[in-house]
Curated annotation (Swiss-Prot):
This is Polygalacturonase. PbH1 repeats lie at residues 187-208, 240-261. It is an enzyme of class 3 (hydrolase). It comes from Phaedon cochleariae. The keyword Nucleus does not apply. Belongs to the glycosyl hydrolase 28 family.
């Protein structure tokens, strides 16, 4: 072989080597000081057995489109009294995956004092997502979240599937509080499916948005499947439309279904196209279905106000059992003319201590 040919081949080899993608090991985050460089260089990222320092946010915000992030092993967030969030993920068309056996541990047991976000120890919120363009988060396991677990904001289209949120240790001595599973704002086209939530507050809390599907959820210990609107001074943020809960179970919870409007501010549009289909309940101790237009500053007043009308609440095959001295199957308190087009079928409950109480009676149900 001529010296010239050897030189050509060597140059080609160097060119191929320089074009080779960054090695997998260089795209693994196992130390907090690697986060920024890995996000800047990689599109297939692994977070492996990471310990996040106290008072720091694991900020996985990427400007690249189509990035994949995989959590392996145990990601632990060190204790500090602060507001958080512990974890932030933002991106377009991103995929976030929990590998088999992985867990994100918020160490909530170090914070819980029975007061949640209402006082006592300052507690960090856990997980904040802003994801668009068909992003998918799947098989994520969250353990012992200090306070509100998960916030979805300015997102969609977005799918979350196969999640497991376990804050059940907070049940002991009623120390866990305000541990909402998913709080959702300013989002369009969201699906959450095949997910388990064990907590002490709302399993799902929809505050604003359109075109939501929640399917095959298993919720226990909290406040049920909730819609809560009216707390923002921005009218558009008090809008909810086209929301479906289906094929889900609510166990050992304060409420099964909770729909409430707050009358500090007005909504632009009435709530429409709200559907609960094939919902089973077990051990509900307050209300199986609770619709209230009387909330102010986080509490019911007994005086309903029609600032945000509810026009269209469809319940189909919603059944279950209640328990305890406070239990009531259905409680509806609506302002005059502010509730309409409630069409229910196959709605029945057993074991309640009190009869249903409705200021507006749905078609297909007897209060």
């Amino acid at each position: 072989m001529s010296i010239r040919l050897i030189a050509v081949l060597s140059a080609a080899s160097i060119a191929v080597t320089s074009a080779t993608p960054v090695a997998d090991s260089s795209c693994t985050i196992s130390s907090f000081d690697q986060v920024a460089s890995v996000l800047a260089e990689c599109t297939d990222i692994v977070v492996s057995n990471l310990e996040v320092p106290a008072g720091e946010t694991l900020n996985l915000e990427t400007k690249k489109k189509g990035v994949t992030i995989t959590f392996e092993g145990k990601t632990t967030f060190a204790y500090k009294e602060w507001t958080g969030p512990l974890l932030r993920v933002k991106g377009k068309a991103i995929t976030v995956v929990g590998a088999k056996g992985s867990v994100l541990d918020g160490q909530g047991q170090l914070y819980w004092d029975g007061k949640g976000g209402n006082g006592g120890i300052k507690k960090p919120k856990f997980f904040k997502i802003k994801a668009t363009e068909g992003s998918h988060f799947k098989n994520i396991n969250l353990l012992n979240c200090p306070v509100q677990v998960h916030s979805i904001d300015h997102s969609g289209p977005l799918t979350l599937s196969g999640w497991n949120i376990d804050v059940s240790q907070g049940d002991k001595d009623a120390l866990g509080h305000n541990t909402d599973g998913f709080d959702i704002n300013t989002t369009d086209q969201l699906t959450i499916e095949d997910t388990v939530v064990k907590n002490q507050d709302d399993c799902i809390a929809v505050n604003q948005g359109t075109n939501f599907l929640f399917n095959n959820l298993d919720c226990s210990g909290g406040h049920g499947l909730s819609l809560s609107v009216g707390t923002s001074h921005e009218i558009i943020k008090n809008t909810v439309r086209n929301v479906t809960f289906s094929n889900s179970v609510v166990r050992k919870s304060r409420n099964g279904i909770h729909i409430k409007t707050t009358y500090q501010f007005r909504g632009r549009y009435p709530w429409r196209m709200l559907t609960y289909s094939n919902i089973a309940m077990e051990g509900i101790w307050k209300y199986a279905v609770n619709v209230e237009q009387d909330y102010k500053k986080g509490k019911p007043t007994g005086i309903p106000v029609g600032n945000i009308p509810i026009k269209g609440l469809h319940l189909e095959k919603v059944t279950g059992t209640l328990t305890g001295e406070e239990s009531t199957p259905v409680y509806i308190i609506c302002a005059d003319g502010a509730c309409s087009n409630f069409n229910w079928s196959g709605v029945s409950f057993e074991g309640a201590s009190h009869a249903s109480n409705c200021s507006y009676v749905p078609t297909g149900y007897s209060c």
